[in-house]
C-alpha cells in the first residue's frame, strides 16, 4: 500500500479512536462506573441516599472488552455468512452490543440499590428510564468507533489478528485509559465539590458525595455534562494518541521492509518525549499552585 494512503487510513483511525475515548468516558460518568463508583456505592451506607445511576457492571476494561467483542462477533458473522455490507454489519453489531450493555446496566443498578434498602436507598425508576437511553447511545458510539478502528486495521492495513480479537484488545485498552484518565475528573473533582480542592479526602468523609445539583438533586446527566468539559476530551485524546502513534511507527518504519528495529527505536523515543513532557507539566503545576495550605481553623483544631 502507498504510504500516503496508509497515513490517510491512520488519520481516520485516530479520529475514530478519539471519538471512542470521549464517548467511553462519558458513558462511565453518566452511569457511574469504575473507580469513583466505590464512593457512590458507599454513600447510602453512610446515610447519604442519592439519585446517581449506580451500575458498575465491572471494571471498565472487561466491560468494554465484552461490549466490543460482541459487536465484532456479530459483525463478522453478518459479513462472512450473510455477505452484508461492512458498514451495516458494524452498525448492527454495535446496536446489539449496546442492547446487551444496557441489560447489564439495568440489572446492575437495580440489584445494587435493592441490596441497600436497609440503608433507605430507594430505586428511582424514572432515573433508570431516563439514563438508560444515553448509556446505550454512548455505548453504541464507543463500540462502533472501536469496530471501525479494528476493521480498518484488519482489512486495509493487513493486521494479522481477526476483527473480534482486535476489538477485544482495543476494548480492554479504552476501558483502562478511561478508568485511569477520565474518571479522575469525575471522582476527584465532581463527587466531592463541597470540600476545598486539593485538600484530599478524609476517611470520615468517605461516601459524603455531592447529592444536590444547581437545581434539584444531582444525577448522572449533571456528571456527564461536567465531565464533557475536560475528562471526556482528555480521554479521547489519550486513546487517540495511543492508537495513532502505536500504528504510525510501524507504518513509517515497516517491519516487512526490514525496518523493525527503527520502529522500536521510534517508539522508545516517543515514550521518552511523553515522559519528559508530563514531568515538565507537573513541575509547572506545582510551582504555579504550590502545596495545599491549611486555613487557620484547621490549624487551631489540629
Swiss-Prot record:
Keyword Transmembrane present in the record's keywords: the answer is: yes
- Could you state one GO cellular component term attached to this entry? vesicle membrane
Q: Which reaction does it catalyse?
A: 5-methyl-5,6,7,8-tetrahydromethanopterin + coenzyme M + 2 Na(+)(in) = 5,6,7,8-tetrahydromethanopterin + methyl-coenzyme M + 2 Na(+)(out)
UniProt-recorded Gene Ontology molecular function terms: tetrahydromethanopterin S-methyltransferase activity
- One Pfam family recorded for the sequence: MtrE
Pathway(s) the chain acts in: One-carbon metabolism; methanogenesis from CO(2); methyl-coenzyme M from 5,10-methylene-5,6,7,8-tetrahydromethanopterin: step 2/2
EC number(s) recorded for this UniProt protein? 7.2.1.4
User: Transmembrane stretches, by residue range?
Assistant: 3-23, 86-106, 132-152, 155-175, 233-253, 259-279
Supply the enzyme class, top level: translocase
Q: List, in alphabetical order, the GO biological process terms annotated in this UniProt record.
A: methanogenesis, from carbon dioxide; methylation; one-carbon metabolic process
Task: Name the UniProt key words of this record, in alphabetical order.
Answer: Cell membrane, Membrane, Methanogenesis, Methyltransferase, One-carbon metabolism, Transferase, Translocase, Transmembrane, Transmembrane helix
Membrane topology summary:
Multi-pass membrane protein
Listed InterPro entries? MeTrfase_E (IPR005780)
Origin, by domain of life?
Archaea
Q: What is its main location?
A: membrane
Q: Where in the cell is it found?
A: Cell membrane
| Function field | Part of a complex that catalyzes the formation of methyl-coenzyme M and tetrahydromethanopterin from coenzyme M and methyl-tetrahydromethanopterin. This is an energy-conserving, sodium-ion translocating step.
Q: How does it assemble?
A: The complex is composed of 8 subunits; MtrA, MtrB, MtrC, MtrD, MtrE, MtrF, MtrG and MtrH.
Q: Which family does it belong to?
A: Belongs to the MtrE family.
Name under which the protein is recorded? Tetrahydromethanopterin S-methyltransferase subunit E
Q: Which organism is it from?
A: Methanosarcina barkeri (strain Fusaro / DSM 804)
Underlying gene: mtrE
